[in-house]
């Protein structure tokens, strides 16, 4: 009897534990498809046909993306009245019942992208009207027209962000966004919009970001969204962009007009805060210097704007598009892939704050460097892929490129640069002059030479760390061509014979170089001075496309990480040299497109097992006049290689001895045939009687 209370307590404890375990197992079974973190439930991609009902009722974020729900019923979300964020992206939704959001008074973010809501858009619109506190709504990819979108957005005055991207909207008027006074972000990209009526966005007083990319807009005229900060109209068919005239102050900071068909530089607001202007891939050019126009009528264009019963005429100067634009705060200007043949006087002077200028792939022939042109704040200048044959530097101009850090002049027609141009560029770190037919100035360089520039001098550019001279047709390098620089990256590729069989011209920068490219330079193994032992910090070496027959020499403490030996004349690799580099940290080596002998690759096991050869599947070798992939070679030494590994002396003896014996027998027969007396003597002396 004394033990009865103890047994009762133990029994009650085990029953409680068992009940808890069973209930926990049931809960885990119902929640196993979802990940629960705090108040967030992630059920994406679980092939759910309905909203799970056993999740914690206090959940505030529910993600059901990529589940075949098809229909959101009135009761689907009732267990979760505290939801603040709901994502139903790619759920094949065709219908949302009218009362689906009736109990979701706390919902702030709703994602319905990539569904089929155009099927029952009226019922969906009625369901959305029950969300008075909704701030973010994503309706992208639902095949909605402008009328459907207008109905769904009706009475949702609390919205801050709306996405209608990827729908079938064609025209916009003031009825589509009526009542959205608090809207700040509007995404309309990837529609079919070809017309925007005047006043379509007038009711959006708080709008700050507008995305109209990937549509069919032919022009934007009388642009007057003064409070807009970011406008993206890229990938349309724009031929004109004209802002509203007058003295209205615009808050526009970023304007993207890239990938259009603009013919003229856009007419920007007279007062703005523009910081980023993207004009890439258009048909723009400046034309004043190309056409001798003396008549004022030939220098203007008039736009007739008809809005109902009101007709406005806008007169624009064709040749001075930028003169009235406010570019004082501009930081980033991308004018690449256009038709600019020159830059007008004073164009860059209007941008004193400009730090990045991209003029890649235009038709520039000359560039005049004057005071404040380019501006002193410029840090990156890209003039690559033009037709530049000469750079003009104003006399007596000092520190014109004092802030420049990156200067790209590749793929032009330059023969040299003005004396002193780089001497004033005290902060330049990256310089690309590849694919220009330049030559390097001898030592000492004439700093006071006159006439057109005929060479380039890189000496004493203390800040220079990266230099590319690929394909410049350079002759043999002069003495100390890079003296006084801090080069860590040097590309001399495709300059045949530039080293003249020696690495001595690189001795000034050899201890600092980390990346060296000597591709397609005609290097061959007979260069006795081709020794990289002095390049103590070298990590990446490209020797592809040369005529090397032996492995380069790497002495000292050189620890390469990447080595490229493709397209050479290597027949084998010395195992000692390769093993040394592997032990020092060689991570990647390229060996393909060399005439290797298959009988000399059996020692490459360390390379193969270490996965060091990046192009191992492409490495081939020669076996009995057949090209075979190394990966397809049989295990062990191939049969055709065994004869090659025999002692050559023994092989020659085996081949010569039968020939000698045959020759001796033939000589004996001939002598005995033509010497009959001798034969008789031999017979008489060797005769003996037969015994029967």
UniProtKB/Swiss-Prot annotation:
Residues carrying a glycan: 21, 74, 155, 232, 292, 309, 312, 408, 427, 500, 622
Keyword Repeat in annotation: yes
UniProt LRR repeat ranges: 58-79, 82-103, 106-127, 133-155, 158-179, 182-203, 206-227, 228-239, 251-272, 273-294, 329-350, 353-374, 377-398, 403-424, 427-447, 463-484, 486-507, 512-534, 537-558, 559-580, 585-594
Membrane protein topology class: Single-pass type I membrane protein
Domain LRRCT as annotated: residue spans: 595-643
Keyword annotations: Cell membrane, Disease variant, Disulfide bond, Endoplasmic reticulum, Epilepsy, Glycoprotein, Growth factor binding, Leucine-rich repeat, Membrane, Neurodegeneration, Repeat, Signal, Transmembrane, Transmembrane helix
Signal peptide annotation: 1-18
Pfam families: LRR_1 (PF00560), LRR_6 (PF13516), LRR_8 (PF13855)
Subunit description: Interacts with TGFB1; associates via disulfide bonds with the Latency-associated peptide chain (LAP) regulatory chain of TGFB1, leading to regulate activation of TGF-beta-1. Interacts (via LRR repeats) with TLR2, TLR3, TLR4, TLR9 and probably other Toll-like receptors. Interacts with CYBB/NOX2; the interaction is direct.
Function noted in UniProt: Key regulator of transforming growth factor beta-1 (TGFB1) specifically required for microglia function in the nervous system. Required for activation of latent TGF-beta-1 in macrophages and microglia: associates specifically via disulfide bonds with the Latency-associated peptide (LAP), which is the regulatory chain of TGFB1, and regulates integrin-dependent activation of TGF-beta-1.
Protein name: Transforming growth factor beta activator LRRC33
UniProt gene name: NRROS
């Amino acid at each position: 009897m004394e033990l009865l209370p103890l047994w009762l307590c133990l029994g009650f404890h085990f029953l409680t534990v068992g009940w808890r375990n069973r209930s926990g197992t049931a809960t885990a079974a119902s929640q196993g498809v979802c990940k629960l973190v705090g108040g967030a439930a992630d059920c994406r991609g679980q092939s759910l046909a309905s909203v799970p009902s056993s999740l914690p009722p206090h959940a505030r974020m529910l993600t059901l993306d990529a589940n075949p729900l098809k229909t959101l019923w009135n009761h689907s979300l009732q267990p979760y009245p505290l939801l603040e964020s709901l994502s139903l992206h790619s759920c094949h939704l065709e219908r949302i019942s009218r009362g689906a959001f009736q109990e979701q008074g706390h919902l702030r973010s709703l994602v319905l992208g990539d569904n089929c809501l155009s099927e029952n858009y009226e019922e969906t619109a009625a369901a959305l009207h029950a969300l008075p506190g909704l701030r973010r709504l994503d309706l992208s990819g639902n095949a909605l027209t402008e009328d459907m979108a207008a109905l769904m957005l009706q009475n949702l005055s609390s919205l801050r962000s709306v996405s209608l991207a990827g729908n079938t909207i064609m025209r916009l008027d003031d009825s589509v966004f009526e009542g959205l006074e608090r809207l700040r972000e509007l995404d309309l990209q990837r529609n079919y919009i070809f017309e925007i009526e005047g006043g379509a966005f007038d009711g959006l007083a708080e709008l700050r970001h507008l995305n109209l990319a990937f549509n069919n807009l032919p022009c934007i005229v009388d642009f007057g969204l003064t409070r807009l900060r970011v406008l993206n109209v890229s990938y349309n068919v724009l031929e004109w962009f004209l802002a509203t005239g007058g003295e209205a102050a615009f808050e526009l900071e970023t304007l993207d007009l890239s990938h259009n068909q603009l013919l003229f530089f856009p007419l920007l607001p007279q007062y703005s805060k523009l910081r980023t202007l993207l004009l890439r891939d258009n048909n723009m050019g400046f034309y004043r210097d190309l056409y001798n126009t003396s008549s004022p009528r030939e220098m203007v264009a008039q736009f007739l704007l008809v809005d109902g019963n009101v007709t406005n005429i806008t007169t624009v100067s064709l040749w001075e598009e930028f003169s009235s634009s406010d570019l004082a705060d501009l930081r980033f200007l991308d004018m690449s892939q256009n038709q600019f043949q020159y830059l007008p006087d004073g164009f860059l002077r209007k941008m004193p704050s400009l730090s990045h200028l991209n003029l890649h792939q235009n038709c520039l022939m000359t560039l005049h460097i004057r005071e404040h042109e380019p501006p002193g704040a410029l840090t990156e200048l890209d003039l690559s892929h033009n037709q530049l044959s000469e750079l003009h530097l104003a006399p007596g101009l000092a520190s014109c490129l004092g802030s420049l850090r990156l200067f790209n002049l590749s793929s032009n027609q330059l023969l040299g640069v003005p004396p002193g141009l780089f001497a004033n560029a005290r902060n330049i770190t990256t310089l690309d002059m590849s694919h220009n037919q330049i030559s390097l100035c001898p030592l000492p360089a004439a700093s006071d030479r006159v006439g057109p520039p005929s060479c380039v001098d890189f000496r004493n550019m203390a800040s220079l760390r990266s230099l590319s001279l690929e394909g410049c047709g350079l002759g043999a390098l002069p003495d100390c061509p890079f003296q006084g620089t801090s080069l860590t990256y040097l590309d001399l590729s495709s300059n045949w014979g530039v080293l003249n069989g020696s690495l001595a011209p690189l001795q000034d920068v050899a201890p600092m170089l980390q990346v060296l490219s000597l591709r397609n330079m005609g290097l061959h193994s007979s260069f006795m001075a081709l020794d990289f032992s002095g390049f103590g910090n070298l990590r990446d070496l490209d020797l592809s496309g040369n005529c090397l027959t032996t492995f380069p020499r790497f002495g000292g403490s050189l620890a390469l990480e990447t080595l490229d030996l493709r397209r050479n004349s290597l027949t084998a690799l010395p195992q000692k040299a390769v093993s040394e580099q592997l032990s020092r940290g060689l991570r990647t080596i390229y060996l393909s497109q060399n005439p290797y002998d298959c009988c000399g690759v059996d020692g490459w096991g360390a390379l193969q097992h270490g996965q060091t050869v990046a192009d191992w599947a492409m490495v081939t070798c020669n076996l009995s006049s057949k090209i075979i992939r190394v990966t397809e070679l049989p295990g062990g030494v191939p049969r055709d290689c065994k004869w090659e590994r025999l002692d050559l002396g023994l092989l020659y003896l085996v081949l010569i001895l039968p020939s000698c014996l045959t020759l001796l027998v033939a000589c004996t027969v001939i002598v005995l045939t033509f010497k009959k007396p001798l034969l008789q003597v031999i017979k008489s002396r060797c005769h003996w009687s037969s015994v029967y």
